[in-house]
Design a protein with these regions (language model features):
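N-terminal intrinsically disordered, cationic/polar leader segments
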Residues: 2-8, 12-15, 20-32, 36, ...
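Short, low-complexity, polar/charged sequence segments that are solvent-exposed and flexible
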Residues: 27-30, 52-55, 80-83, 102
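Short acidic, glycine/proline-enriched helix-loop-strand junctions
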Residues: 41-71
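Ordered, amphipathic secondary-structure segments that act as subunit-interaction surfaces
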Residues: 60-102
């Protein structure tokens, strides 16, 4: 199985917001943002706000727990250009320690 096409990883305690939408999406040109954060994965209000930013940039967005991201990231289509956003360095470390190729 090929590694997922991860084009950028960002640690940001605000997750997805205007700067992510305007600056980082423009630089990395992803077609999917994956928010790997346990709290956001279960909070529809946070998801709604982040979805507005992603929609304004024409990018898909998905919300998963850190563990779910680890479990499914290798199933990503090679056509997906994935931008992973996590809230903390500890979350990024967990992804790395569990085989997410970032």
């Amino acid at each position: 199985m090929a590694d997922p096409n991860i084009v950028l990883v960002r640690i940001d305690n605000r997750l997805v917001h205007g700067q992510v939408g305007c600056q980082w999406v423009g630089i990395a040109n992803p077609n999917l943002i994956v928010v790997a954060d346990d709290e956001a994965a279960s909070d529809p209000i946070q998801q709604s706000l982040m979805k507005m930013t992603a929609d304004s940039m024409g990018v898909g967005i998905r919300f998963f727990t850190v563990q779910k991201t680890i479990d499914i990231i290798h199933n990503a289509s090679p056509k997906q250009r994935i931008f992973i956003v996590v809230r903390t360095p500890a979350q990024a470390r967990t992804l790395i320690e569990n085989g997410v190729p970032i």
